[in-house]
C-alpha cells in the first residue's frame, strides 16, 4: 500500500504540523509496517528516503507548493495539470500510483479564516484526489469556520467526495455533518481524535539548563507557557482577522507574574512555531520579547526554551511541566496527551472541541469574548485548580488514546 500524506509538511517550522506528520506516519507503520509513504512538503521534486519515521523507516518527500511558478513540476497547479494529461513531473508520478491520499489540512486550516491563499493551498490535494479517482481520506481535523459561501461550497464538494472524513471533536463534527447534508453516512463520517495524541515523546540529546534543573529537582514547580507569535507579534492583525478582544501581551505578562507569585518556582516559555527571525508568526520572538519586558525579580525565574527541539522532543519537555497554558493548538495537545493539566487561551472554536474530547473544556478561555482582566483572572484560576484538572484529564486520557488508535485501524481497513 502506498499512501500520500498531504497537509502535514514536516518543513514548515510549525511543530504542530510536524506532530501531525510524524504521528500519522508512526501510527500507520505500527499497524501496517509495509506501507510506503510519500509526504508532500515544500521542497523540490521527489526525494526518496529523505524522511525517517520514529521507527526509522525511510519515506519519500515530494515537493508540492502553492506557487505562481506554474512551470515548476512541484507547483500544485502544475501537478494538477500533469495528472490530467499524464505529464512527467516527479511529484505527479508519485501521486498517480497512490493507493490513497491522506489529507489533514494542517489540523485546522480547512477554513477561510486564514485567507483565500491558504485555503487554495489546502484545497489542492483534495481536488487532485477527486479528479483522479484516488481515494481521499480526510484525517481528523477541524472543519470551518467558513465566512463566505464559495469556500463553503468547495469544502462541501471535498467532504462529499471523500472515502472517509473525520472531525477531531464533536463541535467540528457538527460543521462536517452540515457540509455533508444528505450525503452524511455514519459508516464514512465520524467524530474522531486528533492524531497528535499518538505522537511519541522523545528525550532530547541536549537539554536546556532549566530542564536539567527540573530533572535534578523534581519537586520544583514549573509552569509552562506557549506564547503564540501569531497573536502576540501583530496585535492589530490579531484583532481584525481573529477577533481578539483583549490585550494578549498583557494577559501573558499577568500570567507569568501571577503564577510566580502563587507557587511556581519557574516559568518555561516554550515556542511551538519556529519560523525565521522577524517572521510575524515566530513564537520564539514573542517569548523573548515577553521575558525582556518583565521586572528583574521575575525575569531571572523565566526561561525561554530556545533549543531547536523537534516535535517529539518538545512534547517530552512539555511533559515535564506541572501545568501548561498555550494558544497554539498542538502545543496544548502535547501537554494534554502527556497528562499535564492544561489551560488554553483560544481564538477559535477548535480549541474548545479538542479540550472537550478529554473532558476539560472548562479549561479554555476565549480571547474573543473575555476582557484582559477577566482572561487573566480565569487563567490564574485554572492554575490554582490544576490538581483537580489533572485528575479529570487522566481519567479520560486512556480512552482517548485508544480511540485514536482504533480510528486509524478503521481507516486502513477502508483503504484496503
Predicted region positions:
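Active-site anion-handling motifs in enzyme catalytic cores
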Residues: 1-416
Amino acid at each position: 500500500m502506498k499512501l500520500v500524506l498531504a497537509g502535514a509538511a514536516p518543513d514548515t517550522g510549525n511543530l504542530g504540523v510536524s506532530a501531525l506528520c510524524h504521528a500519522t506516519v508512526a501510527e500507520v507503520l505500527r499497524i501496517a509496517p509495509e506501507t510506503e509513504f510519500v509526504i508532500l512538503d515544500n521542497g523540490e521534486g521527489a526525494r526518496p528516503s529523505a524522511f525517517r519515521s520514529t521507527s526509522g523507516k525511510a519515506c519519500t518527500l515530494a515537493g508540492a507548493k502553492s506557487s505562481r511558478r506554474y512551470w515548476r513540476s512541484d507547483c500544485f497547479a502544475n501537478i494538477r495539470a500533469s495528472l490530467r494529461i499524464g505529464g512527467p513531473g516527479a511529484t505527479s508520478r508519485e501521486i498517480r500510483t497512490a493507493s490513497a491520499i491522506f489529507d489533514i489540512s494542517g489540523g485546522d486550516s480547512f477554513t477561510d479564516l486564514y485567507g483565500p491563499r491558504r485555503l487554495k493551498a489546502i484545497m489542492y490535494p483534495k481536488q487532485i484526489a477527486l479528479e483522479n479517482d484516488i481515494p481521499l481520506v480526510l484525517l481528523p481535523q477541524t472543519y470551518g469556520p467558513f465566512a463566505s459561501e464559495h469556500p463553503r461550497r468547495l469544502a462541501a464538494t471535498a467532504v462529499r467526495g471523500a472515502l472517509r472524513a473525520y472531525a477531531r471533536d464533536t463541535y467540528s463534527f457538527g460543521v462536517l455533518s452540515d457540509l455533508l447534508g444528505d450525503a452524511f453516512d455514519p459508516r464514512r463520517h465520524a467524530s474522531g481524535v486528533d492524531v497528535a495524541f499518538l505522537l511519541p515523546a522523545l528525550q532530547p540529546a541536549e537539554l536546556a539548563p532549566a530542564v536539567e534543573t527540573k530533572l535534578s529537582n523534581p519537586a520544583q514547580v514549573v509552569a509552562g507557557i506557549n506564547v503564540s507569535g501569531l497573536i502576540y507579534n501583530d496585535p492589530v492583525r490579531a484583532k481584525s482577522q481573529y477577533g481578539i478582544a483583549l490585550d494578549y501581551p498583557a494577559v501573558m505578562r499577568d500570567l507569568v507574574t501571577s503564577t510566580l507569585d502563587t507557587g511556581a518556582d519557574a516559568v518555561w516559555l516554550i515556542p511551538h512555531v519556529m519560523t525565521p527571525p522577524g517572521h510575524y508568526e515566530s513564537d520564539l520572538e514573542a517569548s523573548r520579547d515577553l521575558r525582556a519586558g518583565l521586572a528583574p525579580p521575575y525575569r531571572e525565574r523565566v526561561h525561554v526554551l530556545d533549543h531547536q527541539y523537534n516535535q517529539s522532543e518538545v512534547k517530552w519537555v512539555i511533559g515535564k511541566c506541572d501545568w501548561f497554558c498555550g494558544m497554539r493548538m498542538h502545543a496544548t495537545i502535547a501537554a494534554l496527551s502527556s497528562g499535564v493539566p492544561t489551560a488554553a487561551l483560544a481564538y477559535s472554536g477548535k480549541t474548545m472541541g479538542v479540550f472537550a474530547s478529554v473532558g476539560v473544556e472548562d479549561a479554555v478561555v476565549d480571547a474573543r469574548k473575555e476582557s484582559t482582566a477577566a482572561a487573566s483572572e480565569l487563567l490564574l484560576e485554572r492554575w490554582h485548580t490544576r490538581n483537580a484538572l489533572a485528575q479529570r484529564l487522566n481519567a479520560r486520557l486512556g480512552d482517548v488514546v485508544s480511540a485514536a488508535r482504533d480510528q486509524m485501524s478503521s481507516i486502513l481497513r477502508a483503504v484496503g
